[in-house]
Amino acid sequence: MLGFSFFLFLLMRPRRMQGSQEPCSVIYLGRDNLEKNHDKSLKEWLKTHLIVPPMELISRILHSLFPTSRLPSPDLLGPGLAFFILAALLHTGHSAKVLQTASSAPSPILALLLYTALIPAAAYVSVCIAGSTLSLMETISLMGYASYGHILAMGIPVLFHQEESEIFFFWCLTVFGGLSSLRIILVLLVSVRIPAARLVVCSLVATLHLLSLVFLHFVYMHTTFVYGGN
């Protein structure tokens, strides 16, 4: 009996593998496999959401302005690229404003971070309440690609009219902001399961999307608008 107990003690005692500082015993069997599987799943997730072929990325950006209900596999590369383009655009417009009007506005990067965090969060909460089939990643990808409508609606007036014509901006708002909002609405109409909630959710998300565009334009791109002024 004593010999059998001693044999069990030797079997269960942690041993150091050759060339390793980590103890190894029968208790730790499968630990390396779990770590490898975790690393593999993390790499697959990063590869799926952060690596997009260039032509596929261009196609997704173009399709973000087409009114279609088809939603491609979600990724973060397109929304991330839109974030940096918007940051550069807002900083350019903010630096061109008069000093008195620019100093009253919050930092462009702060406003952009709040926009990036709050708009997708509000959209996701709304679609969850309405019983939508969209996941969080799909919602972030949908709203992120819709930001290219913001880029075109604010960037084209700067290139052609230097923000001198408000009519031209509102025309761009109607075209590019309207197309991106229409695509959001079509995707939500397909994904929301509760018929009575479709109108409310689509109206809310599209309104937030367009109001954020109007806010960013007047606060950071308009040359004479004073944020918080009387």
Where are the regions that the model predicts?
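Residue-identity detector for glutamine
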Residues: Q18-Q21, Q100, Q162
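Compositionally biased, intrinsically disordered low-complexity segments enriched
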Residues: S20-P23, G93, L211, V219
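Hydrophobic alpha-helical transmembrane segments and adjacent short intramembrane/lumenal linkers
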Residues: I129-F225
